A protein has these predicted regions:
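Repeated loop/turn-to-beta-strand initiation elements of outer-membrane beta-barrel proteins
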Residues: 85-91, 113-117, 166-170, 180, ...
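Outer-membrane beta-barrel translocator domains and adjoining extracellular loop/strand segments
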Residues: 56-62, 102-106, 120-122, 130-136, ...
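Outer-membrane beta-barrel "beta-signal"
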Residues: 697, 726-738
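Membrane-embedded beta-strand positions in outer-membrane beta-barrel channels/transporters
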Residues: 44, 75-79, 104, 157-159, ...
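Transmembrane beta-strands of outer-membrane beta-barrel pores
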Residues: 49-53, 94-100, 111-113, 121-127, ...
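Outer-membrane beta-barrel domain signature
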Residues: 62-69, 92-94, 143-151, 159, ...
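Residues that define the transmembrane beta-barrel architecture of outer-membrane proteins
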Residues: 39, 69-76, 99-103, 150-156, ...
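Transmembrane beta-strand segments of Gram-negative outer membrane beta-barrel proteins
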Residues: 36-73, 90-92, 172, 266
Length: 738
């Protein structure tokens, strides 16, 4: 939706009128009087700006529509190219929009018979809404500090190519990507609903819900760096082509999350003493990657060719961080700064080997077959440690002498082997009909063993040190991990005539993960255990295009997808099988209709309707909110039903002026606040409608201007109306030929 609405104002211009002119045969009788007078400039600069006047929740408007609420202006697009007489060419393009913080500069220099250099920098901003949550039982709305959040993404790039005639082509590139800012997120953890009464950090009273919601909204602070250096060589010897690449990557990330343990404390009669802010899950990641890839394409005969690919990569990583969760200690009757996991340190290494071979066979012009096999082997090892603090048993005073510190150790090792055969077919021997099919099966067999975190060293506040070894029966695991995936599809495209086109495709996905406790080590924690999860999906894609006339077309799409999720767990089964349980069901039906009509030379109309019926049912659909008979038990699915309608009218006002009208309406009604009595309501209910009108005018052969105004309106029951917004947005642009 964000891309669509931004297109209305910036990227699309008045493209609908151009679509009118492109319809085949429409201008055949009067081509010398083509009313489209808008030229295509070889080099140009385009200045633009927009200004919203939004009432309501501006922080909700920005991420949904992709516009800065403070407006933006600058150079929307710039392009310059020039070819020299000695084979040298220069191209420059870019933009700089202040407010939206969207910038690009790209310089390309090339010379025939030598190569090219492309260097530049780009940066853009993505907006997020820091909504913490809405509690329908009390009507409370929580935001996480500043509600208007954003992430800035920047990238410097340098790409060079050396391509002399009859010589190998050499390439080198360097990219540095940066991601910084804050965004909304969520994690698994307990918060207390304001409907409950919290005194001195403890839940008291009988206010519903008695259970605690276990999804925490939080603010994620991001600071990430990613550098990539790559060198390559492409060579052709006879008919054999080879492409070799060597890549180095460096990653340095520091991310963190923060949330409020007791939201809306001391508000509207809700007593939270104290309201605890938690700085949770501070993570640092430093990694280095070395990768070498080689691809060879060798024709064996006229209708048979061989493709071989080899890849090796090694990743070395060090992770760190802190996980500090302040909590109320009922014995000491005070807040204790619990270090759930502090001074985290892990060292991991991954070695990955991949090889694939493909045979491409085309015995006749109307039949193609690809046979392939991919084999992958990887080894993953890591070990680490962290500290945990706790108040000594029975202590009522929080100080260093009463605090125990444990150093936990952990380790894991995984060996994985994946074999994937593939086949694809295409047949075009029937006039105007193309039939295709593909099948692949991913066979993954692995073995893993690990040591759950255990307190290797415990030090009391008085200096007493205790050491321990991991328990074989509770901390040490040996397990086989098998993951088998099957994907298949078959389809056909039938271009019966210019009046009728039909496309159909059926696909099937079957995925299953099995984890079997190894019997080689008697007494291990996973001895004899068996656990399996999986899912299967069957889907159909149907598309019908009907064109009664060159000026009128109907496109109908129907995409049903049905699937079941399953789980099986039985620690008493020794590597055998048990009764599989259907843990979830997914049913999706997507129906859409598009109509394009150009009744006259100067008029174009388009209408779209899209309906989605989507629900996921889990094995726990009933939400028990009360044991009394007067409160009904709600039934909860993860519904995602919605309806979207849009329409567009474009027409030519004069030889130099076009106009466009466009509107969109979307609605969903899946929210059931009654669920909050005993759980978390996942469904969303909202209504969005937007309209805009735009005019494009050519002042002369070098100058074109555009002006647009739109109105946005959004209502959300999911957030109790606290994120509603409405208001106009004004846009203008001037494009000048250089």
């Amino acid at each position: 939706m964000q891309t669509t609405l931004r297109t209305l104002f910036r990227g699309a211009g008045l493209a609908c009128v151009g679509a009118v002119l492109a319809l085949p045969g429409l201008w055949a009788a009067d081509s010398d009087k083509n009313p489209d007078a808008f030229p295509t400039f070889d080099s140009y600069i385009k200045f633009s700006g927009y200004a919203p006047a939004i009432h309501g929740d501006k922080a909700a408007f920005a991420p949904r529509n992709g516009f800065s609420t403070s407006g933006s202006g600058g150079v929307e697009d710039f392009f310059y190219s020039k070819d020299g007489s000695n084979g040298v060419a220069i191209k420059m393009n870019g933009h700089a929009l202040v407010g939206a913080e969207d910038y690009l500069f790209d310089l390309n220099l090339s010379k025939d018979g030598v190569g090219s250099v492309d260097v530049g920098y780009k940066r853009f901003r993505t907006f997020y809404d820091g909504v913490g949550g809405f509690f329908p039982l009390t009507g409370l709305f929580q935001t996480m500090g500043p509600e208007a959040l954003h992430i800035d993404r920047g990238s410097f790039f340098f790409d060079a190519k050396f391509a002399r005639p009859n010589m190998p082509v050499f390439t080198v590139s360097f990219h540095q990507d940066v991601r910084t800012g804050t965004k909304d997120s969520s994690e698994w953890g307990a918060i207390v609903n304001p409907a409950a009464v919290v005194t001195a950090g403890a839940l008291v009273g009988t206010a519903a819900p008695a259970n605690t919601p276990f999804i925490q909204p939080n603010v994620m602070t991001v600071s990430e760096r990613h550098r990539t250096l790559e060198a390559g060589a492409q060579a052709t010897v006879g008919k054999v082509k080879e492409d070799l690449k060597v890549t180095f990557e460096w990653v340095g990330n520091t991310d963190g999350r923060a949330y409020v343990r007791y939201p809306n404390g001391n508000a509207l009669g809700v007593i939270a003493d104290p309201t605890v802010a938690v700085v949770d899950d501070l993570e640092t990641v430093t990694s280095k990657t070395f990768r070498v890839t080689d691809k060879i394409v060798a024709p064996i005969m006229e209708n048979l060719s061989l493709e071989i690919g080899l890849n090796y990569s090694r990743v070395s990583a060090e992770d760190g961080g802190q996980w500090i969760t302040p909590a109320y200690n009922t014995t000491a009757k005070a807040i204790f700064q619990t270090v759930t996991a502090g001074n985290i340190y892990t060292n991991a290494r991954v070695d990955d080997y991949v090889g694939n071979v493909f045979l491409k066979f085309e015995p006749v012009s109307y039949f193609k077959m690809d046979l392939g096999f991919r084999d992958e082997y990887n080894v993953i090892s890591d070990g680490g440690s962290f500290i945990v603090t706790s108040l000594a048993s029975g202590q009522t005073v929080i100080n260093a002498a009463n605090t125990n510190t444990a150093t936990d150790l952990t380790y894991s090792h995984l060996v994985d082997h994946v074999a994937t055969p593939e086949v694809s077919l295409q047949y075009t021997g029937i006039n105007k009909l193309s039939i295709y099919a593909s099948f692949d099966k991913r066979i993954n067999h692995g073995s893993q063993h690990w040591v759950n975190p255990y307190a290797a060293v415990t030090t009391t506040g008085t200096g007493v040190v205790t050491t321990a070894l991991p328990s074989l029966s509770s901390a040490i695991f040996f397990q086989d991990a098998n993951q088998d995936y099957v994907n298949a599809k078959v389809g056909a495209n039938w271009n019966a005539s210019s009046f009728f086109t039909f496309r159909a495709e059926v696909f099937r996905k079957e995925h299953q993960n099995k984890f079997i406790g190894s019997n080689d080590v008697v007494g291990a924690a996973s001895y004899g255990a068996y656990y399996a999860t999986g899912y299967n999906f069957t889907g159909v894609n149907l598309t019908l295009v009907v064109k009664p006339t060159p000026e009128l077309s109907f496109t109908t799409r129907f995409q049903p997808q049905y699937g079941d999720m399953s789980v099986l767990g039985d620690v008493a089964i020794t590597g055998g099988s048990g009764n599989e349980i259907t843990s979830g069901k997914s049913r999706i039906n997507m129906i859409s209709e598009s109509i394009d009509w150009a009744p006259t030379k100067e008029l174009y109309l388009q209408g779209n309707l899209n309906m989605i019926y989507d629900y996921i049912q889990t094995s726990y659909p009933d939400v028990v909110v009360s044991t009394t008979s007067n409160i009904p038990v709600p039934f909860q699915n993860a519904d995602n039903n919605s309806v979207t309608c849009s329409g567009l009218v474009g027409f030519v006002l004069t030889h130099n002026t076009d106009m466009q009208l466009q509107g969109m309406w979307q609605r969903a009604n899946n929210y059931n606040p009654q669920i909050s009595l005993g759980g978390i309501p996942y469904g969303a209910s909202y209504e969005i409608n937007n309209v805009n009108i735009g005019v494009k005018h050519k002042f002369n052969d070098h100058l074109v201007g555009e002006g647009k105004v739109g109105y946005f309106n959004s209502k959300s029951d999911t957030t109790g109306g606290f994120t509603n917004y409405r208001g106009p947005l004004f846009y203008f642009s001037i494009q000048y030929a250089l």
